[in-house]
Amino acid sequence: MPVLSLAQMLEAGVHFGHQARRWNPKMSPYIFTERNGVHIIDLVQTAQLMDEAYEYVRSASEEGKRFLFIGTKRQAAGLVAHEAQRCGSYFINQRWLGGMLTNWTTIKTRVERLKELERRQETGALDLLPKQEASMLRREMEKLQKYLGGIKQMRKLPDVVLIVDVRREYNAVQECHKLGIPIVSLLDTNCDPDEVDIPIPANDDAIRSIKLIVGKLADGIYEGRHGQLDTEEDYEDYEGAEADYDEEIDFEPEEEETEE
């Protein structure tokens, strides 16, 4: 039985690609037709490739491999955080900071700084400081939580990266290539399939499409780790996709040269 039925994908709008004039010719094998100037994705191929992707992440999870979900676009941010946490994985859903993987040593120092500030907050140590200093440290902690909270427990580089939009996450894709980290990703009709290892042709803009695909990948990871899936009733639908997204960026990690 396929992981996704054609009915499920049609209902979620997985088949809707971009306007034909915005396509990437390399996606031609995955396009069924053009309708009213919009490319329609071949859902038969999507179903087959989704089965392969599901088995890939399930098997990798069963082997103990760790996953990083990346989705920083507004309609993906909340879903990415929710599904990654549900299957015990890491996530980045606000902004990709340059060198997050290739310069992991520097990023890790910021993660440790976050943990330190959280410990001081929990023990009440911040309350003993002058009001202005405590306020400054709390603001620093909140910024670190926003941009690095999803990788707070990540002790080493991930084994597999799952991406919602490879065009938007171009820098993350390049870092994965440099480090040899395999990429599983949705591929809309304007994407380059050569950039990923495990492609899933699908609408990467519609919330319902993203939720369906990312949710099933999370199911595969969960199944590999725990042996079976819990029932759907054990998880509430996540409706805060856009509420958890903040476009304001004013945190940058310390500058450091990336090792070649």
UniProtKB/Swiss-Prot annotation:
Protein name: Small ribosomal subunit protein uS2
Coiled-coil residues: none
A Pfam family reported for this protein in Swiss-Prot or TrEMBL: Ribosomal_S2
Gene3D superfamilies: Glucose-6-phosphate isomerase like protein, domain 1, Helix hairpin bin
Keyword terms of this UniProt record: Ribonucleoprotein, Ribosomal protein
Keyword check for Cytoplasm: no
Organism taxonomic ancestry: Bacteria, Bacillati, Cyanobacteriota, Cyanophyceae, Gomontiellales
GO function term, MF aspect, one: structural constituent of ribosome
Recorded name of the encoding gene: rpsB
